[in-house]
């Protein structure tokens, strides 16, 4: 399975779903874009991290990072792994120093967590072929 690296291109309110946001990812070495509709709270968490804003109290994704580091777990990468019936699936690839493991997550949560750990975001060709736009 060849992984394709993505980067965040933009985040805006969704034209099609009220109260939702469109997170637009793009191929790092290509022209295709991958739009994903996400919720308001996840969009806020992603935007806060992109803008390097420090909230007064930790958000859920900040808490996850603190907990993971406290117990010796590091996030290695985020993988948007599948698209089934219009729903994206992703994995957070982690390591505890002796073994690597995957956590199933919504892409919005995986990306919010991945941003906090400063890791790369990937997808696979089948997802980009089905949902990607040029």
List the predicted regions and their residue ranges:
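Divalent-cation
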Residues: 1-134
């Amino acid at each position: 399975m060849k992984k394709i690296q993505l980067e965040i291109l933009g985040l805006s309110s969704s034209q099609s779903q009220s109260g939702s946001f469109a997170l637009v990812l793009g191929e790092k070495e290509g022209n295709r874009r991958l739009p994903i509709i996400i919720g308001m709270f996840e969009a806020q968490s992603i935007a806060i991290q992109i803008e390097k804003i420090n909230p007064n109290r930790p958000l859920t994704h900040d808490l996850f990072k603190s907990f993971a580091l406290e117990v010796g777990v590091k996030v290695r990468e985020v993988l948007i792994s599948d698209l089934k019936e219009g729903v994206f699936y992703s994995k957070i690839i982690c390591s505890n120093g002796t073994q690597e493991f995957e956590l199933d997550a919504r892409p919005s949560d995986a990306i919010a967590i991945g941003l906090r750990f400063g890791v790369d975001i990937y997808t696979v060709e089948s997802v980009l072929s089905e949902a990607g736009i040029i």
